[in-house]
């Protein structure tokens, strides 16, 4: 028989974080919640109190009153494929596009991409997206490709291919998310025990970070604001909570598949890259008659970051001096090849720090990254998933 009454309180390993998308801000949807993998969380509520500066002859401060009640949301994570797609989409104000799901034995490889004799087979593919191709006998035709042009019967890619007749069973897949204007909020719950829950309605994500560093797996965090924190004794999910994806976390070795700048591989050795997404100006809205938030200001999407390389030449430094906007993109995948291509179509390198930190050390160059809306594409960041 197992021993009982051994614990002084709730253990962190028993805490489950789950969520559902809201149709109406702050209102719990009648759907199954989804569990989230996480390495730490910081969901919490707080009250703002104020007291008048009254002049009193008893030399005591006047009692305080509650003026606002707030709640904050936070998740730290190790990046794994598919786990945070909803949260990332909410942060960027958009949805991933309908997945490209093309397959068949009627797809041929060409020196510049792919062709088919089947009319309309490639109509779901558009210029600019990244796709994952598999099934060809020639390895040059498989892998991750950036589409530069597409029609119903042909796809042109930035990466060279090889002439290969149709015949093998080939699959082409991908889905794209860009920053948009849609507002998406979530209903989160923190399960502490079978009858102990904390609930965070109206959660709106206002910031996120993804970091790759030598010797580490991909890490990240999301931060946001919630309408209020309240307690509950029952599960808010309609039915059982859906389990989180179980894929392996993305590592910084095979899981990092190169950084491109201006559509060419960066020749320098990369030591680390960080991207920060923020909704500047996002805030809860308050009014008379209630301490709780009455609405949300969405803010505007900004993308910043940094990249650190082993210094060897002035190739990137020259773009900093000229303030030339370039396309930046990198890919991260798990051991099954599932993952993301993260792209800034109009990025600037700024404020490099090229320093000799001490004897016997590598000279590193750290550049700040600044994303801007692309003049013709109209977005600041794109995330393709495979």
Regions found by a protein language model. Name each.
Residues 1-386:
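Signature of extracytoplasmic/envelope-associated structural regions
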